[in-house]
C-alpha cells in the first residue's frame, strides 16, 4: 500500500519553506509595529485608528519588500515610521481635534 504526502515533492517543500519564512518575516514586522504602542500609551480611539493604519501600511510594505527579494536586513526599514515621527503625527492630530 502506497502512502502519499502532500509535501513530498521538492516544489512542495520549497513552497512550504517560503511560506514559513514569509510568516516569520510578517511576525518580525508585527513585533516592530507592536513596539510603537509603548510610545503612545493610553491614547483614545481617535489616535488608535491612524496608529493601526500606519502599522498595516508598514506590514504591507515590509512583506512587499520581502517578496521583492531584498536582503532581510533592509526589508523592515522603519525610518519613515519611527516612534518619533509617529508621536509628531499623533501630536498634530491632537491639536487639530
From Swiss-Prot:
Keyword Disulfide bond assigned: yes
Disulfide bonds, paired cysteine numbers: 32-62, 33-76
Single annotated GO MF: chemokine activity
InterPro entries the record matches: Putative_chemo_U83
Stated name of the protein: Putative CC-type chemokine U83
Entry-linked Pfam families: U83
Coiled coil: none
Gene Ontology CC: one annotated term: extracellular space
Keyword terms, alphabetized: Cytokine, Disulfide bond, Signal
Domain of life: Viruses
Similarity section: Belongs to the intercrine beta (chemokine CC) family. Highly divergent.
Amino acid at each position: 500500500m502506497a502512502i502519499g504526502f502532500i509535501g513530498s515533492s521538492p516544489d512542495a517543500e520549497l513552497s512550504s519553506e517560503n511560506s514559513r519564512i514569509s510568516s516569520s518575516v510578517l511576525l518580525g514586522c508585527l513585533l516592530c509595529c507592536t513596539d510603537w504602542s509603548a510610545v503612545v500609551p493610553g491614547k483614545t480611539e481617535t489616535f488608535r485608528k491612524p496608529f493601526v493604519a500606519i502599522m498595516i501600511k508598514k506590514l504591507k510594505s515590509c512583506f512587499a519588500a520581502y517578496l521583492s527579494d531584498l536582503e532581510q536586513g533592509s526589508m523592515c526599514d522603519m525610518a519613515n515610521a519611527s516612534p518619533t515621527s509617529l508621536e509628531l503625527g499623533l501630536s498634530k492630530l491632537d491639536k487639530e481635534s
